[in-house]
Design a protein with these regions (language model features):
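Conserved, mostly hydrophobic/aromatic
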Residues: 150-151, 213, 254, 318
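Acidic (Asp/Glu)-rich catalytic clusters
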Residues: 25-26, 69, 104-118, 158-162, ...
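N-terminal basic, low-complexity leaders that serve as flexible interaction/assembly modules and, when applicable
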Residues: 1-71, 107, 344
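Aromatic-lined glycan-binding groove of carbohydrate-active enzymes
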Residues: 194-283
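Catalytic-face loop-and-helix region of soluble metabolic enzyme cores
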Residues: 243-345
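Active-site-proximal loop/turn and secondary-structure-junction residues that shape catalytic pockets
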Residues: 125-129, 171-175, 217-221, 258-262, ...
């Protein structure tokens, strides 16, 4: 059982990129397959700083001002009058994040003697970014622009780093919509072609680009948008993604949200039962996002047993349900250490 890895979703409350990356390595270095940057420019607010940058760039303007106390109360944007939104108008910041982190990553990897470690760059899907920035009308009218801007950065990062990077696609809006419409989530997935859209984003990137997929239910201010009744919506969406995934863009992992913000993972075996139907391809790891600060370690060990019994095998890695950037630093450090301890059980 010691072969389980540890996965960090991305954000971490570090004072700098180096501080965040060192903290994650200190907690679980030998168990890490990928090392995120910590997303220290945006760790607390996730997509909000990206959208605010787009306003500053003149690509978007405020349509309806919100408080951002929750994603439901977010600010909604539109394209300025007389302009047509294109990918060339938008700098999403991912390339700059990779450029800043690359030297730090290479130095830390060499110092820790972890030659197999890969840099991880997280980015929301085009659907999620358009949905959060502009609502459903934005998805309908402007998704291509967000896709083009995202693919431009993926291409540039691939050229910069080569095979030493995994791009983590973060499908928050897709997963929240699936969970909210349960038990009608299959109809929603078919109507909006959510899995197809995630796979199509990968297919638009250069051949050989390595990916992971983080299916997320949100954690703004450590509050989730939704709590699943069981894991059926996750399994259905993950299987849809895998079925349509391009064969020449390796899908290295799928990460599942098994907790929900401040709500700990379920103690009901039935919640995890749909994992028996999860159909990942060979070479795609399953990362269980259940590490949480509310239960005791002993309770979390029991939860891990429920997950693995439902899955029918050991998980490939353990993780929190979302990034640790919305948590105070002492809690983030404790959760990182807990992940390592649970992986070792």
């Amino acid at each position: 059982m010691g072969s389980r890895g540890v996965h960090f979703v991305g954000s971490f409350p570090g004072t700098s990129t180096e501080d965040a990356m060192r903290a994650m390595l200190d907690a679980a270095g030998p168990r890490l397959r990928t090392l995120p940057t910590g997303e220290t420019r945006r760790y607390e607010f996730y997509i909000q700083p990206i959208i605010e940058d787009l306003v500053a760039q003149g690509a978007l303007e405020v349509k309806k001002l919100g408080t951002w106390r929750s994603s439901r109360e977010r600010t909604i944007h539109r394209v300025p009058s007389g302009r047509e939104l294109t990918g060339d108008m938008m700098d999403l910041g991912y390339l700059g994040e990779a450029e800043e982190a690359l030297a730090v990553f290479r130095d830390l990897r060499a110092a820790r003697e972890l030659p197999e470690l890969t840099l991880q760059i997280g980015m929301p899907t085009d659907f999620t970014l358009a949905f959060i920035a502009m609502g459903i009308p934005g998805v309908r009218s402007h998704r291509k622009a967000f896709r083009d801007a995202t693919v431009r950065d993926i291409t540039a990062i691939h050229e910069l780093v080569g095979t030493d990077v995994v791009v983590q696609l973060e499908a928050t809006a897709e997963m929240v919509l699936m969970a909210k419409t349960q038990p009608l989530h299959r109809r929603l997935e078919a109507a909006l072609r959510l899995g197809e859209g995630i796979a199509a984003l990968a297919e638009s990137a250069p051949a050989g680009t390595k990916f992971g997929v983080h299916l997320c239910v949100g954690s703004m201010r450590n509050k989730s948008r939704v709590r699943m009744r069981d894991l059926r919506p996750f399994v259905e969406l993950a299987n849809s993604v895998v079925r349509q995934w391009p064969s020449d863009r390796p899908l290295t992992f799928v990460h599942a949200p098994l907790a929900a913000g401040d709500i700990p993972p379920s103690a009901d075996p039935g919640f995890y039962a749909p994992l028996a139907d999860l159909a990942l391809d060979t070479g795609t790891n399953f990362y269980a996002g259940f590490v949480h600060d509310s239960p005791t370690v002993a309770e979390q060990v029991e939860t891990l047993g429920l997950i693995e019994n439902a899955l029918g095998r050991p998980v490939d890695g353990v993780a929190s349900a979302c990034g640790l950037g919305r948590r105070p630093r002492p809690i983030a450090d404790a959760l990182a250490a807990r992940a390592e301890a649970l992986a070792a059980t």
